[in-house]
């Protein structure tokens, strides 16, 4: 590369990443808006503690099925058309959620949204297309920052907006706002998001895009290092999703907190997670490597989950302990979330980035499907603290796997 073309390539890469950041941020902002009110909405429609976690679970079941489909399809047709379809369809899914008058229709709306928004692996593959391997953890951190900012603003405003009824129904305004954001996002991406995968780089060996392709899954996990990353990601997301979907019930039942107050805790999680993914990870990854970041993040989260489960025992100081635990969870997540896909991506072939990252995120989506149900079952059948105390042990086990298998 000549000296005069290198700055131009750097500028194009920065512009592409900036546009992708805005696209992912608006997508996740809409997702974050509905987090605080979904369990409460399910309860108002007659759901118990366990069933109240099902909207989150069915969303992730559909993501589990469709993440590898969109990932492999993007390896064949390019990233841009898949991302545009996903954003456009997600607007319809959010509108359906706002209009749904019964629990079965809420579940149907979340299922459709799960199909539509199964695009995270495509976004990660986009980053892999435009960043050299040495900068990949920094690039993946862009998605982490978008996640963090989505969790800062989305749950906070979702909690506040849920206080205002729409069409005589409480708690549905966040869904309509999310639908509007997705529509705006589609128009911006249609105009500004360039294709990252030129036709010559599109894999000729890409299989027909079908759900639950066992052969493709086996191919990805047998890539050295990728199988361990997939297993760790599954355990990590399993317990994180269980915490995320039961947290609203926990704060209401043990601390008497409203949707808005719970949204502020999620906002804290977003601030800390974004700070780690945008400031700490880019500096540490080149020095200590993604594997060590994953190990450290899992240990921090294990300690934080235990602290969260014990928070009600601290009496008047319990709320402060809850906030501390949330901040530590965010710090651990901020280290682990960008490091795992960066680790897997560095070990995948250039024409298998979508397949590898799709497999990683498909396992994560399965964990997000099982996690809320597991968390809800532990919450309802054993004790409200059980998802966090048992989750601490699970995260510690994932940390041990990381020490043994990630190099």
In which residue ranges do the predicted regions lie?
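Cytoplasmic helix-loop-helix junction between adjacent transmembrane helices
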Residues: 109-148
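C-terminal transmembrane helical hairpin of 12-TM major facilitator-type secondary transporters
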Residues: 292-340
């Amino acid at each position: 590369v000549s000296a005069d073309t290198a700055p131009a390539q750097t500028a194009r890469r920065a512009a592409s990443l900036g546009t992708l950041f805005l696209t992912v941020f608006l997508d996740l902002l809409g997702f974050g808006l509905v987090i605080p009110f979904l369990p409460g909405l399910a309860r108002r429609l007659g759901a118990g503690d366990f069933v109240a976690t099902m909207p989150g679970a069915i969303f992730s079941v559909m993501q589990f099925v469709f993440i590898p489909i969109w990932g492999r399809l993007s390896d064949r047709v390019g990233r841009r058309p898949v991302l545009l379809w996903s954003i456009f369809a997600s607007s319809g899914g959010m509108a359906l959620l706002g209009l749904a008058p019964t629990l079965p229709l809420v579940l149907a709306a979340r299922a459709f949204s799960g199909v539509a928004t199964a695009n995270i692996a495509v976004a990660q593959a986009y980053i892999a297309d435009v960043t050299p391997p040495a900068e990949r953890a920094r690039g993946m951190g862009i998605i982490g920052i978008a996640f963090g900012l989505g969790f800062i603003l989305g749950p906070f405003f979702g909690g506040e907006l849920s206080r205002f009824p729409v069409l005589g129904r409480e708690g549905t305004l966040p869904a309509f706002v999310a639908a509007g954001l997705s529509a705006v996002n589609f128009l911006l991406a249609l105009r500004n998001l360039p294709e990252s995968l030129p036709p010559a780089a599109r894999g000729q060996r890409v299989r027909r895009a079908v759900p639950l392709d066992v052969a493709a899954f086996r191919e990805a996990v047998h890539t050295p290092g990728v199988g361990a990353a997939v297993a760790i990601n599954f355990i990590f997301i399993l317990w994180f999703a269980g915490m995320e979907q039961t947290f609203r019930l926990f704060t209401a039942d043990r601390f008497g907190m409203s949707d808005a107050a719970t949204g502020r805790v999620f906002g804290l999680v977003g601030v800390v997670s974004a700070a780690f993914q945008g400031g700490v990870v880019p500096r540490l990854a080149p020095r200590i490597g993604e594997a060590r970041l994953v190990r450290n993040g899992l240990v921090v989260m294990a300690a934080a989950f235990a602290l969260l489960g014990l928070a009600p025992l601290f009496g008047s100081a319990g709320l402060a302990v809850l906030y501390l635990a949330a901040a530590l969870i965010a710090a651990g997540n901020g280290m682990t979330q960008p490091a795992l896909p960066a680790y897997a991506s560095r070990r995948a072939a250039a024409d298998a980035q979508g397949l590898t990252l799709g497999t990683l995120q498909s396992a994560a989506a399965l964990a997000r499907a099982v996690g809320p149900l597991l968390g809800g079952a532990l919450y309802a059948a054993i004790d409200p603290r059980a998802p966090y105390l048992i989750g601490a042990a699970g995260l510690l086990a994932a940390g041990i796997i990381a020490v043994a298998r990630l190099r």
